[in-house]
Amino acid sequence: LDQLKTAQGIIFVTPIWWNSVPGMLKGFIDKVMKEGDGLTHTVTKTGVRGCLTNLKRAYVFTTSTSPTFWFRTTSGNSIQKIFINKTLKQLGIRKAKWYNFGNISHASKTQRDHYLVTCQKRPLLF
């Protein structure tokens, strides 16, 4: 938790399972990042106010068996709407960028390798 309080940003790398992030990531956020009033958040009359405002930006890299366009348009776009716009904001993280490799179950090794190289070359600004 001390490292989170002094970091400038955070990177999440996770699959999308059943239209959401896995329970293990939710548990990490629940037990580590929100482990008590005043550590990473404050409970107010209007809800949770995030205290990790030092984290200027988050990057979320995901994979999904569904195509990205389908996930964003038909499936409800839950990574953006819930994980980024709600969960991360409740922790105090105001800016986040999401990159998804969709249709991964039909991707070749060459396509997966290309995606990893593309991720490595992305400029991550914190």
Language-model segments: residues:
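Helix-loop-strand module that forms the ligand-binding subsite of alpha/beta enzymes
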Residues: 1-81
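Glycine-rich phosphate/pyrophosphate-binding loop and the adjoining helix
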Residues: 70-126
